[in-house]
């Protein structure tokens, strides 16, 4: 027996996995369900885990696996008083994306996670597990610097970037400043200004007039090599 919100969240996650192969962010789930805070999403996910519908994959950010879906076509009864959907039957577990599906994406060069550095052109290809990529066109950049460490992005990591020229508040983006310097930062708007926020207290936010900043992509995933 699931609540209507649990049912709605489960299907939203599955739709995103089917479309892009990557779980939605907590912010996207919050907006999709019309909730005011992410804590409500945390509670819903925990409840779905306890009931065996959902599993969090260890050591991976934004990694959720739908284990089963309720068979709503055969038996759904909604009780408006307590907002509960009663479910009689669920199909077998869904197949996750194969872990060995590999896609090659262009490796453009290095990007600063500190202060902006020169953007690089194409040099080589990087083999990436398909599960780390969503829909759309992607490229990779090697991270240089430590200003995003509190977001789990470290020097030498490969940032997997979905090509885009727009960003939402709080997205981690590749921002091109003055047409020549690229940097990886959180994207914020302050009136007519763009603020590029680090994730390291040792660095200050960078503020620029909006016309000086061009979004070149949004962070889709990370690849880390251990030597």
Swiss-Prot record:
According to UniProt, the reaction catalysed is: Hydrolysis of Ala-|-Gly bond in repressor LexA
| Residues of the site described as Cleavage | 113-114
Which Pfam families does the protein's record reference? LexA_DNA_bind, Peptidase_S24
- Enzyme Commission number, as recorded: 3.4.21.88
| MF terms (GO), sorted A to Z | DNA binding; serine-type endopeptidase activity
Record feature DNA-binding region, as residue ranges: 26-46
> Into which EC class is this enzyme placed?
hydrolase
* UniProt record, GO biological process: DNA repair; DNA replication; negative regulation of DNA-templated transcription; proteolysis; SOS response
Q: Which Gene3D superfamilies match?
A: Umud Fragment, subunit A, Winged helix-like DNA-binding domain superfamily/Winged helix DNA-binding domain
Identify the InterPro entries for this entry: LexA, LexA-like, LexA/Signal_pep-like_sf, LexA_DNA-bd_dom, LexA_repressor, Peptidase_S24_LexA, Peptidase_S24_S26A/B/C, WH-like_DNA-bd_sf
Function field: Represses a number of genes involved in the response to DNA damage (SOS response), including recA and lexA. In the presence of single-stranded DNA, RecA interacts with LexA causing an autocatalytic cleavage which disrupts the DNA-binding part of LexA, leading to derepression of the SOS regulon and eventually DNA repair.
Record's PANTHER family?
A: LEXA REPRESSOR, LEXA REPRESSOR-RELATED
Q: Which HAMAP family match?
A: LexA
Assembly behavior = Homodimer.
Q: What is this protein called?
A: LexA repressor
Q: What is the lineage of its organism?
A: Bacteria, Pseudomonadati, Pseudomonadota, Alphaproteobacteria, Sphingomonadales
Gene that produces this protein: lexA
């Amino acid at each position: 027996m699931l609540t209507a919100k649990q049912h709605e969240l489960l299907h939203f996650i599955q739709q995103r996995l089917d479309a892009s192969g990557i779980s939605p962010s907590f912010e996207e789930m919050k907006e999709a369900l019309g909730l005011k805070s992410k804590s409500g999403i945390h509670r819903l996910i925990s409840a779905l885990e306890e009931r065996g519908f959902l599993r969090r994959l260890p050591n991976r950010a934004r990694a959720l696996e739908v284990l089963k879906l309720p068979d709503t076509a055969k038996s759904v009864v909604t009780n408006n008083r307590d907002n509960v959907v009663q479910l009689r039957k669920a199909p077998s577990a869904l197949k996750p994306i194969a872990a060995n599906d590999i896609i090659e994406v262009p490796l453009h060069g290095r990007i600063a996670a500190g202060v902006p550095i020169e953007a690089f052109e194409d040099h080589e290809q990087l083999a990436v597990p398909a599960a780390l990529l969503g829909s759309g066109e992607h490229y990779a950049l090697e991270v240089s610097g430590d200003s995003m460490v509190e977001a789990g992005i470290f020097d030498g990591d490969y940032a997997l970037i979905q090509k885009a020229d727009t960003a939402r508040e709080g997205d981690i983006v590749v921002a091109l400043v003055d047409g020549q310097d690229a940097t990886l930062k959180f994207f914020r708007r302050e009136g007519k200004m763009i603020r590029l926020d680090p994730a390291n207290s040792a660095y200050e936010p960078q503020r620029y007039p909006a016309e000086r900043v061009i979004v070149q992509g949004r962070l889709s995933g990370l690849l880390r090599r251990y030597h």
